[in-house]
Amino acid sequence: MYTWIVIAGGVFSFIAAMGIGANDVANAYATSVGSKALTMKQAVVLACVFETSGAVLMGSHVTNTIRKGIADYECFEDDPGALMYGSMCVCACVGMWLFIASRYEMPVSTTHSCVGGMIGMTMVIKGSDCVIWYQAKDTFPYIGGVSGIVLSWIISPLFSAIISSSFFGTIRFLILRSKNSFNRTTYLFPIMIGTTVTLNAFFITFKGAKGIGLDDTPFNVACAWSFGIGTLSAVIVYPFTGAIRTRIMSKNTTSIEVEHMECKINDNINDDNINDDNIKNKKPVCCNDLVKYINDNINVNLDTIVENNTKVNEIHEDAEVFAIETEDYFKSLQVFTAICDSFSHGANDVANAIGPFAAIYIINREQQVNKSNELGSDAYWILGFGGIGITFGLLLYGYKIIQAIGLKLCKITPSRGVAIELASAIVIITGSRLEIPLSTTHCQIGATIGVAALEDPRNCSGLNASILIKTVVGWVLTLIVVGGSTALLTAQGVYSPEIGGNKCDNQ
């Protein structure tokens, strides 16, 4: 009798996943696109592969927390339909808010959105006593429920800022500010590759894929495997450092010639009076409005955004500049860290869209509310379903948040991006292993602040205060908007038909 809720919940959860793609996936790729290590097209392709992979292989931990760690399931044992309907409302309101926030370039927290929705739904149906406000845990941070999640909202940006500033400060001191930074980078590149691979391999191995038993990997085994993989990566890269060095030098030698050629081409275009309208008119008829919209989004001119905004242009102009050749070394490293960040993002944030739908699906399948019920093999297609939604969201609307974080918040270069992405990935995967649904937005913003603050520690002139304030305001509004709208929508569906009935009398 609740099949319609399963179908509607699936649709709304897919929309919520699209909203996450439009808003939160930019957290993984904004720095790479902003530093021009990746194009928007490349970011979309990588997101499609690694967001979905992270969700399917590693997302079950956090999905369980979103699904079972906020609301007390025992309160719903006698009313499974209400929990299903309430979870559907959570998905609908989360998706709605994420698209609104993306429209106004507010990188909000999807974790805030989902948790706030679950709280609002539970309080309306069963009261505040059925919300798990506090729960003692045996592992760090030893606090579960809503209290543990709220604590993570403070800890995650703080830790991300500390780690990213430490990473970038070390890189800047040892390499970037050296007179022979290019040579130093050449010598240290295998070590940097090995270190990056080791860190990411450790957290991926230690967290593991639950379906194949890697989530039980002991700490010492994870350390041994990750160190071995990192060392092997450094050894493999070492023979190619000479070729990489030659390619970078050749690339920068010919860059001036390319710029001259582009100028001549632009002059010819102007002389021939060829404008955008002429070009658009020559497109094939099969290119419909949706294709054109997507194409415009992934080909947006990022340089124009910087030039047209006075404050953003000042931040970019005043930022410390390092050798172009040295920065080029960090591009390949940044792409790798972006992939790891994307992988961890898929593991963490797909749960925000799929957690409530997982509750709907299990209740409908088992015909009862039982906290011990697991998704089993169904987790893979459900998490994959969410990963695909995230990719579509990035494709349709992700450029908005990429502009806000990757360009407008501060100046991002490949070396800065490596520190930001690596710090964010470490905090996110650690939290996911501990079954804490961290805010990816908080981690990314915190890591970005940590790097940008090093430009001028006293005045923080490397940060765009207006963007930062708008972001914080968005975080506050998230709890109010999603929690309130979910409560209203849930109340309308659960209580309106039964005013004066048994359900109201029982509450």
Regions found by a protein language model. Name each.
Residues 1-268, 276-507:
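Alpha-helical transmembrane segments and immediately membrane-proximal extracytoplasmic
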